[in-house]
A protein has these predicted regions:
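N-terminal amphipathic/basic leader segments beginning at the initiator methionine
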Residues: 1-22, 320-328
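Glycine-rich phosphate/pyrophosphate-binding loop regions near the starts of catalytic domains
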Residues: 5, 13-165, 171
């Protein structure tokens, strides 16, 4: 079998062959129960659930592919809610004619990330659609996690809190911009796609109170901060020069006239906590090499009108608006 055929979606021999020969070599070890439409699992305590769909193009990009992205993206949504990712459900929409070699490459990435995340698969589904109905491959995931750090909410911001950023921003969005065929830029910049739970677990196990936490995906840093300001009815002031930004990312943004604060990230989080706890939080984060750039970028102030203000090195301020319009479709 060199490519996916419509017969691979008929529920018969061809479907069984696709599952057994292509999917199972990579995913079998993670599946909770075979031959069941709805596997059972025990749950005690508080849990959280997140569903996401992945339609990124190209399927393979600098720093990852749709396989790595779908596991990390779904697990990260659970992690930033204070949860430990435990289970994943996956649905694959395959285009007729999709190369089996490409599918295997993506499944191998999924296998690698599932192992890293210690995730189990509860259920798995495949559908095949006629050529042209989708662009090669779409993946839907649902992640289930157990809350180990309760009390995290976008409604919990208060004056006197510090805003911490875990790493340099806009690398995923900028690298995707550079890769698209219509923008012929040569760069070694890679997506920041990664699992966030290993970075967050030490914080969760500490005695620190985390008030708000979010991964800055679509809409970037600007989207997260504006959602927080509106949900908690506060003013957030960000020091522009404190936001870590790679030179390559900065260059791409300047050439293309992009605002790095609105570009997507896939391995960066923002958190809010009491200012007095910020030094300890940074110490914990920076003990992991992948969070060496973590820093305080701003603070929460009292204000009757929710807003996000960006202050430059000269003290001039401007409003950082919620992103509007479609900058780059199919970013994740």
């Amino acid at each position: 079998m060199d490519s996916v055929t419509l017969a691979c979606g008929n529920g018969g021999k061809e479907t069984s062959a696709l599952i057994e020969r292509v999917f199972m070599p990579y995913l079998k070890e993670f599946i909770v129960a075979f031959d069941e439409d709805a596997p059972k699992f025990e749950a005690r305590g508080e849990y959280c659930v997140s569903t996401d769909s992945f339609v990124i193009t190209p399927l393979i990009f600098n720093g990852g592919d749709i396989g790595k992205l779908c596991v990390c993206g779904s697990a990260n949504d659970v992690s930033v809610q204070g949860g430990e990712p435990l289970y994943l459900n996956m649905g694959f929409i395959l285009e007729e004619g999709l190369e089996i070699s490409l599918l295997k490459q993506i499944l191998q990435s999924i296998q690698k990330e599932l192992f890293k995340a210690n995730l189990k698969l509860l259920s798995l589904d495949t559908k095949v659609v006629p050529k042209g109905s989708v662009d090669k491959l779409f993946i839907n995931t649902t992640c289930i996690g157990k809350i180990i750090k309760p009390g995290i909410s976008s409604r919990h911001l208060q004056p006197g809190q510090a805003i911490i950023l875990s790493d340099t921003i806009a690398n995923h969005g900028a690298s995707l911009f550079a890769m698209r065929h219509e923008i012929k830029l040569k760069t070694n910049l890679e997506s920041d796609c990664q699992l966030l739970y290993p970075l967050l677990k030490p914080l969760f196990l500490s005695d620190l109170k985390i008030d708000a936490l979010r991964d800055a995906t679509r809409g970037g840093l600007a989207s997260v901060l504006n959602e927080w300001a509106n949900s908690s009815r506060v003013k957030i002031v960000i020091e522009e020069e404190k936001i870590p930004l790679k030179e390559e990312t900065k260059g791409i943004c300047e050439i293309l006239g992009l605002e790095p604060y609105t570009l997507a990230n896939e391995g960066v989080f923002v958190l809010a906590l009491n200012q007095k706890d910020a030094p300890k939080a940074l110490e914990i984060l920076k003990s992991n090499e992948k969070a060496k750039n973590a820093c305080v970028i701003g603070e929460v102030l009292e204000n009757p009108y929710p807003s996000v203000v960006l202050k430059n090195a000269w003290g001039f301020e401007r409003i950082l608006e919620m992103p509007e319009g479609e900058l780059l479709p199919r970013i994740c």
